[in-house]
């Protein structure tokens, strides 16, 4: 329970009293209201900071030049089914009604909560006379796939009969440590499968096994070898490990040996509590909103392609700092977001 915490809402009757929350032993992400309470704790910390206090509100503190938080409510609302059931209804299911992303009532409530919570921050900024000098950036690190509920196809599914995930096909190629149920390690399998092999020299054999089981795993596309290296550093163990994040000879252990992308709508799960997932390359995963607000910025829609990686250098430029102070900006040539500064600034490297 979180006594004294009420969730933000667009109307009083929509607010949830977190003091009435009775945890059932699961985490915050297993309940539509619990995730709002979790987010509201973070919102309250930001509100305290705006009002010139520590995040707990216990004492005075300088207002930060930059602050932010991560909302989980919309992400959870997109994929959660609670109570878990093979039958999805408006009473137990978030996500969307159709392929055009019409939100179900549970999902709409999560969106409205986040809307109201951001409204609390805006109101606090105005109260403290900070709104006119503040830029607000709202975006997402990922979406959820599939948006269309009719395309959701869990493998193996609760019945276990919908197919076999890649880990079930190439178990003999995987490190033995994955077999220990207590080590917390395993493949990253959601709406994508990222595979680290016990022996990278057997990559071609593992790929052949996956392709032979294409129907069972819902195979869409496989990246390995040269095709994988066009996206990431080559997989492997560095010959001479250097400082963090430097490119190193001999391979990068963060890169899997194989990346398998299933057909659209396939999610590797046997869990009845989810109807979508993230982490993959699907359009629903990677196409997210990005809103920048400042009283000096004219309201308009920018239709040019941008990436969320551009947010970080944009923040530095807004603060009067050099975006090139970031290694990634220098190495990858990441520009600031377009149309926010003087003409030509969006081409800054």
Q: Predicted segments — roles?
A:
Residues 2, 51, 58-63, 67, ...:
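Extracellular/periplasmic catalytic domains that process cell-envelope and extracellular macromolecules
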Residues 14-30, 53-54, 58-113, 150-152:
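Active-site His/acidic residue clusters
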Residues 17-20, 76-81, 145-149, 203-206, ...:
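Extracytoplasmic/secreted cell-surface and envelope-processing proteins
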Residues 36-41, 101, 105-116, 200-204, ...:
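Soluble non-cytosolic domains of exported or imported proteins
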């Amino acid at each position: 329970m979180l006594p004294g915490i009420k969730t933000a809402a667009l109307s009083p009757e929509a607010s949830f009293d977190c003091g009435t929350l009775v945890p059932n032993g699961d985490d915050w992400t297993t309940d539509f209201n619990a995730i709002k309470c979790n987010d509201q704790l973070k919102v309250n910390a930001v509100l305290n900071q705006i009002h010139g206090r520590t995040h707990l509100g216990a004492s005075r503190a300088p207002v930060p030049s930059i602050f932010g938080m991560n909302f989980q409510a919309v992400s959870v609302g997109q994929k959660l089914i609670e109570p878990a059931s093979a039958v999805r209804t408006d009473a137990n299911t978030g996500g969307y009604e159709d392929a055009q992303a019409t939100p179900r009532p549970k999902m709409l409530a999560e969106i409205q909560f986040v809307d109201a919570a951001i409204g609390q921050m805006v109101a606090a900024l105005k109260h403290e006379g900070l709104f006119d000098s503040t830029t607000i950036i709202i975006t997402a690190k990922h979406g959820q796939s599939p948006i269309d509920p009719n395309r959701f196809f869990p493998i193996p599914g609760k019945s276990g009969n919908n197919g076999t995930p890649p880990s079930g096909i190439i178990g003999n190629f995987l490190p033995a440590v994955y077999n220990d149920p207590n080590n917390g390690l395993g493949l990253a399998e959601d709406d994508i499968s990222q595979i680290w092999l016990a022996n990278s020299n057997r990559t071609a054999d593992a790929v052949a096994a996956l392709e032979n089981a294409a129907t069972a795993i819902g195979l869409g596309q496989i990246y390995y070898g040269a095709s994988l290296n066009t996206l990431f550093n080559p997989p492997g163990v560095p010959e001479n490990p250097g400082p963090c994040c430097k490119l190193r000879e001999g391979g990068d252990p963060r890169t899997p040996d194989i990346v398998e992308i299933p057909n659209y709508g396939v999610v590797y799960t046997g869990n009845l509590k989810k109807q979508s997932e993230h982490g993959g390359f699907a359009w629903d995963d990677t196409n997210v909103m990005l809103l920048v607000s400042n009283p000096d910025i004219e309201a308009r829609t920018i239709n040019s392609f941008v990436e969320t990686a551009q947010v970080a250098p944009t923040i530095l430029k807004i603060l009067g700092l050099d975006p090139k102070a970031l290694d990634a900006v220098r190495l990858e040539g990441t520009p600031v977001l377009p149309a926010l500064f003087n003409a030509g600034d969006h081409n800054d490297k």
